[in-house]
């Protein structure tokens, strides 16, 4: 028998509950800002798992960052079996804070020292 993998969206704030100060706090950490930028530029509208990002950090650390982004309303996360995939809530963020995602897209990460 073949198992069926169901999709479940994890809890997140409704569009009208997304607060600018919470979004800015979530984006204030350079790693999270870079994760959101990568999703916007390289995978618009396509949910990605944490392995796709190629970040050399413990899985628990990445899970923490993804959770903060989701709870702030920046990303949505869906559970597919054992895998969680994230994507930016573009429509919701543009409706609440027009132009914010353009700033994220245009942000240039500092050069590595």
Question: Which ranges hold each PLM region?
Answer:
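N-terminal helix-turn-helix DNA-binding core of bacterial DNA-binding proteins
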Residues: 22-58, 80-95
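Amphipathic alpha-helical dimerization/coiled-coil segments
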Residues: 2-21, 37-42, 79, 89-113
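Canonical helix-turn-helix DNA-binding module
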Residues: 51-74
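Short, Lys/Arg-enriched C-terminal cap helix and immediately downstream tail that follows
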Residues: 73-76, 82
